[in-house]
Amino acid sequence: MADNSPLIREERQRLFRPYTRAMLTAPSAQPAKENGKTEENKDNSRDKGRGANKDRDGSAHPDQALEQGSRLPARMRNIFPAELASTPLEDFDPFYKNKKTFVVVTKAGDIFRFSGEKSLWMLDPFTPIRRVAISTMVQPIFSYFIMITILIHCIFMIMPATQTTYILELVFLSIYTIEVVVKVLARGFILHPFAYLRDPWNWLDFLVTLIGYITLVVDLGHLYALRAFRVLRSWRTVTIVPGWRTIVDALSLSITSLKDLVLLLLFSLFVFAVLGLQIYMGVLTQKCVKHFPADGSWGNFTDERWFNYTSNSSHWYIPDDWIEYPLCGNSSGAGMCPPGYTCLQGYGGNPNYGYTSFDTFGWAFLSVFRLVTLDYWEDLYQLALRSAGPWHILFFIIVVFYGTFCFLNFILAVVVMSYTHMVKRADEEKAAERELKKEKKAASVANNTANGQEQTTIEMNGDEAVVIDNNDQAARQQSDPETPAPSVTQRLTDFLCVWDCCVPWQKLQGAIGAVVLSPFFELFIAVIIVLNITFMALDHHDMNIEFERILRTGNYIFTSIYIVEAVLKIIALSPKFYFKDSWNVFDFIIVVFAILELGLEGVQGLSVFRSFRLLRVFRLAKFWPTLNNFMSVMTKSYGAFVNVMYVMFLLLFIFAIIGMQLFGMNYIDNMERFPDGDLPRWNFTDFLHSFMIVFRALCGEWIESMWDCMLVGDWSCIPFFVAVFFVGNLVILNLLIALLLNNYGSFCTSPTSDEEDSKDEDALAQIVRIFKRFKPNLNAVKLSPMKPDSEDIVESQEIQGNNIADAEDVLAGEFPPDCCCNAFYKCFPSRPARDSSVQRMWSNIRRVCFLLAKNKYFQKFVTAVLVITSVLLALEDIYLPQRPVLVNITLYVDYVLTAFFVIEMIIMLFAVGFKKYFTSKWYWLDFIVVVAYLLNFVLMCAGIEALQTLRLLRVFRLFRPLSKVNGMQVVTSTLVEAVPHIFNVILVGIFFWLVFAIMGVQLFAGKFYKCVDENSTVLSHEITMDRNDCLHENYTWENSPMNFDHVGNAYLSLLQVATFKGWLQIMNDAIDSREVHKQPIRETNIYMYLYFIFFIVFGSFFILKLFVCILIDIFRQQRRKAEGLSATDSRTQLIYRRAVMRTMSAKPVKRIPKPTCHPQSLMYDISVNRKFEYTMMILIILNVAVMAIDHYGQSMEFSEVLDYLNLIFIIIFFVECVIKVSGLRHHYFKDPWNIIDFLYVVLAIAGLMLSDVIEKYFISPTLLRILRILRVGRLLRYFQSARGMRLLLLALRKALRTLFNVSFLLFVIMFVYAVFGMEFFMHIRDAGAIDDVYNFKTFGQSIILLFQLATSAGWDGVYFAIANEEDCRAPDHELGYPGNCGSRALGIAYLVSYLIITCLVVINMYAAVILDYVLEVYEDSKEGLTDDDYDMFFEVWQQFDPEATQYIRYDQLSELLEALQPPLQVQKPNKYKILSMNIPICKDDHIFYKDVLEALVKDVFSRRGSPVEAGDVQAPNVDEAEYKPVSSTLQRQREEYCVRLIQNAWRKHKQQN
């Protein structure tokens, strides 16, 4: 369609009309006109409203595509007349039709919306001054000028303050003032919509500009630092690039969508904080105090002398190598004091400058938030358990489960939904633009043809069209009727780059091509690449000269091979075709850099070319399908990834400048407050340090930096660091996961390509043929012919199915399967006849074993035996030798279990046969365990103890019954299905990390050594400059435990960096490093931070997030499979199927009958009254608030006031309990919340009467406080008014069971590792994170430690202890001493495997579960029905069916449908709607509730534009005994119609007669 067509002109005139003075008064007259249509279009507006411009309840809202600051949609932008750009227009958003607004659209299509009211009470939209201001404001050059000014200002903010910067500040202030004046004149100040101060961005601009003028007269001190917040305006630069805009729109939408979740999170933190306050108030001040001397050195014992003695810190216990005083406790399992000391509370401050405590509500809230974010939480965890006892792990489990695993993953779900929405919107916009371009091209061709210019359009590369005159086209067709003649450039390119000059040369090309393009040559190059990678990985510190020469020679050889390969391929293919392959281009670049490295090898300062050797590693992707797939997908999504990285680093830049301006001077002015009086490495004194401290907070470590900031500053550090963590870690990094989910689905779930496998098979075939020429006796070797792809697929599926088949699948039949495979029967055809006695006996034995194996009681007995033997393993701790009875029990149980599991294996072998037994993973596990048992038994009889740990393998059998637990199938199947994909990601991650490991060896090998004194204090470089000086002065030249001396250590160091545990020391050593054998200097090599930043971005943020992607996708598939949903079902079918399932599972509830007795009736009315519930809610809030103001060290008067208030609340809650019990009677106890209330009241009253007795013998007041805090959970019922909170709580409620299943799986894994941890590490020496409380000596202590390690917290300290092989004592078998040495190899295998299984797999399953359920709930709320809709239906149904008979009368149906609320409501008159629903009618004219609900569900889907066909989804059958439909509403209408016809005919007949 042409641009000047009548249709376009009409649409232009309708949409884009210049704003006139007449329109200023027009909107006031329009409401009356519109109101006249309200009743007329009521039903249409409800059912057929403007989709995106209507809320779920039908209320209108502005069109998001036309909102202020947006860009015109593609179709509107295509028809927008250029002459109306920057001109006031009538508002084209229907929402603003009745409001005094107008819009201005720029040439680029940006929308600016203004109020039609007078600006500053005197400037209407047509005043020349305001029109000039509007025209200036909407000009892109004005925005670009302001943005450039802000960016330049940001650069000057980085610089130190000088006279020049002061003058520039005045210049910037003048520019900002002009901007404010222009915008205020154009928009107005504040009174009208879209005024200047109605935009939150302008609040900051105005405040900072105002402060700038005030500071010219008055010194505002630190308040002047608020000017730093102007840097937030640089955020608007993202609108320049469309890709950046998509990311920022997703970020903004995520933050705005998180408001409901933030309120829920704050409520949860509030509850946990009050609970922590009541439990741990003052606990973290407990210290070991020396006994009062009895020798009279302090005089006689008096209270004053006791206080002075215990207040003296010299009398507090502190080990020699400790910095802070250790905490202690008086409960079992807590930290014990040494002899001569007593654990007392209230001495000294709290840990970490006093900022870690539960003494007041504020500090408790901060501590709980720290627990939820898992930042250095292991320190608080260890402090609390050391001082309160090991059973307090339950508090931390609850906080971490609900806070971290649940609510923080809700943030991921919201961010993923926001990103998906914005990407979908951007894709739709791009698709619309592409469609418009096609229409425009077609219209242009049609227009030219109509004007008599006969032309032909030829599409080139699918993107652009070239219009060629018919005469030229005919001339070209004479030479080549199909292709156009090549241009001069093409002919010159062919002459120079296509080498086909003569026949001998072409033969030479063919011969070389046959070699270099053969599969054998490809395999040879792959082997060379692997060898080259191996040689690069062998580089290490302190290599001898001979080894270094070998590596150098190897590099020369590999470089020569690559050069020869490139030259041969260029000769064989010619340059034109060689460089068309991207892999060839990559290979050629590597060759160029290799030649440059060889040529500049001896030049000082150009060793940087050595780093380009690492590019050779990526050549392996050409021969590794998994890596190739990963890199290809990574390349495709490169743009989106770069956009996310840009937004992330822009945020870091903004926060870094803000932090530097706000807190920078505090570190300089108050440096003496730090313990050593030295400036900490992480500070805000300059931009680089500010950037790194903000980057550290983005990585999840913010609490320690915040403590330092608060030590030299004030509480304002808290909101800054919380904001950085929230936006950076919880939103930006989750955006990266959303990007992976959106772009990496093929890598996460699709199988890898087998093209390279076929090449490898061809190469191996060639090798066999070559050997055949030399060895004729190899003729017997035959290669099987290639199977068709379909056969391969079928075979692989069969094998995979056999591997994944569970025991229940094998035992599902009625008869035992074949015992052996088909090949066995072919090899031994002579078997006993089927009717022989031997065969019958064999069959009977197998039949009996088969029936026994199928018996559920036998299976339960085996499971019970497994649990018992696992419990016995848990009892084998370090104290077992001190319990001889238990030793004998475990010994005899081992014998019995060995016999039992052997018998069970024989029974299962007879039952399922060898074929099925050895093709099932679970039976293979049983077989390995039994073999380990037998081997262990033999070794015990032989007196060999080295391999007796093989019996621990039986603990792995716990996973088999785990898969049979109800509800665990989805979790275990997700874990099993994810294993191959996880293994692929691990391999890709190891390969990807290899690049950084080799680079780290090249950069830091041998440079982490340092000179230390006898106290392990690093000496200054001014004392010892190098290794020789250190040894000459009799100091110690030692290496850091984590270093880059070789690739193995480099991998371990990178793992600590990727998990952000122990990474600070590694980075400190790196930036302090100089040359080999040189003493480090603080931050002399500070730009080495870049190496770690790049690794964290690509190696941690990118690679490790792939695990989340895999688990989310596979869990979704397994859950659909478990629910019987097909992967081919449409989205509407899935939503409707879920709605049908809810319909069939819900039932009406009987209403509580009202008592007939008048006093009880009054109590009933009060109990069910909503105002009474609101009153009690307010009282609960006040009760919790009183609990929150409780604090440690409060005065006696304050405590008495709290006691009186507590008594008042107990009386009030007692009265409430009496009222409800009297009114509701026994129905009161059917509500779990009422049971909690009743239990609290009973225990509270008992506590008042028998406080001393209860505290000493029955229950402590602390537990009463815990029960009291549970009442706060009742507040969750009052979140029903907030739809967003209801959806989140609904998703949590639905996911809770699956989340518990994941937690149970995590516990089983912890159980297994606790057993192995006790076996391997119970005797290790206390070091690092291992001490008298946290160790592997007992099962309980192992679980406590493994729970901490499940979040990767403190694993670096644990590794240091269990890998200690030097500073320890070797075992002495003669003395029976087991030794306290660790094992480096065993420690690495134990910890790395545990971290991968828990942190990267199981913990990420929480995210998968939460995301899946949140998406389901939001899909249902948008296109389906929520649980609130079902609850509403049953509440209304209860009014018509108070006895819960599940039936109502047919004549009540119309009233029922009218009484419902949207979206289920069907307003009167609804007679014909009822007929169209065709609801079944049962006997006695009753309607069944499921029929009504199912009909309403179908009606809702139909009205929302997603009708479900009759055959799409079959609803489950109703198996009610009394359900007997006899008719339907439609059939009843037909019957009534027929009756009326008969009656009318009869009347006519009677009248005629």
Swiss-Prot record:
Ligand binding (saxitoxin): E378, E704, W1063, D1356
Residue positions with a glycan: N300, N308, N312, N330, N683, N1015, N1028, N1034
Pfam families assigned to the protein according to its UniProt record, in alphabetical order: GPHH (PF16905), Ion_trans (PF00520)
Tissue expression per record: Detected in adult nerve cord, muscle, gut and mushroom-shaped accessory glands.
Main location: membrane
Keywords, ordered alphabetically: Cell membrane, Disulfide bond, Glycoprotein, Ion channel, Ion transport, Membrane, Repeat, Sodium, Sodium channel, Sodium transport, Transmembrane, Transmembrane helix, Transport, Voltage-gated channel
Organism encoding this protein: Periplaneta americana
GO CC terms, sorted: voltage-gated sodium channel complex
GO molecular function (one): voltage-gated sodium channel activity
Comment block on domains: The sequence contains 4 internal repeats, each with 5 hydrophobic segments (S1, S2, S3, S5, S6) and one positively charged segment (S4). Segments S4 are probably the voltage-sensors and are characterized by a series of positively charged amino acids at every third position.
Paired cysteines (S-S): C288-C337, C328-C343, C709-C717, C1011-C1030, C1368-C1381
PANTHER family tied to this protein: SODIUM CHANNEL PROTEIN PARA (PTHR10037:SF288), VOLTAGE-GATED CATION CHANNEL CALCIUM AND SODIUM (PTHR10037)
Segments on the Extracellular face: 160-165, 219-224, 281-360, 386-392, 539-549, 604-605, 659-686, 708-719, 876-888, 941-945, 1002-1047, 1070-1086, 1190-1200, 1250-1262, 1317-1338, 1362-1387
Superkingdom, taxonomy of origin: Eukaryota
Regulation: Inhibited by the pore blockers saxitoxin and tetrodotoxin.
Residues the entry annotates as binding tetrodotoxin: E701, E704, G1062, G1354, D1356
Biological role: Mediates the voltage-dependent sodium ion permeability of excitable membranes.
Cytoplasmic topological intervals: 1-140, 187-200, 242-260, 414-519, 570-583, 624-639, 741-857, 908-921, 965-981, 1109-1171, 1220-1231, 1280-1298, 1411-1553
Protein name: Sodium channel protein PaFPC1
Intramembrane segments: 361-385, 687-707, 1048-1069, 1339-1361
